[in-house]
């Protein structure tokens, strides 16, 4: 969308897989910032901005269940990489997953269930051996968003620099 690439085959989502989720994930940061919320989050009758204490609660709620969500994403990444690095055929998908998930599971696996059978990203969704990019994007976007937090989340020069030096490059 913001790429300056002449050919679409080197822009948009046709970038290095380590980068593919950064543009979408960085955008999620603005939604819980007071300056952004004040642009639209207003009472429908009084037009009062969302109270500061509610904004604080919204930010704090991001930590609720975060460890479990993190482990879940790691599990997906482990399963993805396990399938795409395995050389021998797998006879028992449930057992295969049980061994993989032992590293990340807080709970015992439920019998007769298999994530792989409905986890479209790793086979048909374009993320084969690349599901890790979601977690990696969180690292990249957190680092990139720090510039916006330091300079103001709507700081024009920071935004121009991010677009020019990061988003516009595509796969160059």
Map each language-model feature to its residues.
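C-terminal, non-catalytic "cap/extension" segments appended to globular domains
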Residues: 1-21, 26-34, 38-172
């Amino acid at each position: 969308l913001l790429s300056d690439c002449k050919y679409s085959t080197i822009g948009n989502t046709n970038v290095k897989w380590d980068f593919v989720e950064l543009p979408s994930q960085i955008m999620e940061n603005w939604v819980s910032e007071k300056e952004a919320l004040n642009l639209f989050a207003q009472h429908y009758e009084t037009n009062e901005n969302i109270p500061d204490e509610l904004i604080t609660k919204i930010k704090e709620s991001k930590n609720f269940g975060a460890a479990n969500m993190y482990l879940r994403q790691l599990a997906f990444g482990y399963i993805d990489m396990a399938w795409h690095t395995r050389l021998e055929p797998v006879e028992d998908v449930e057992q295969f997953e049980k061994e993989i998930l032992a590293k990340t599971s807080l709970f015992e696996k439920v019998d007769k269930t298999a994530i792989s059978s409905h986890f479209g990203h790793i086979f048909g969704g374009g993320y084969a051996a690349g599901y890790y990019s979601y977690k990696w994007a969180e690292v990249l976007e957190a680092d990139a968003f720090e510039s916006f937090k330091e300079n103001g989340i709507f700081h024009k020069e920071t935004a121009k620099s991010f677009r020019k030096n990061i988003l516009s490059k595509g796969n160059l």
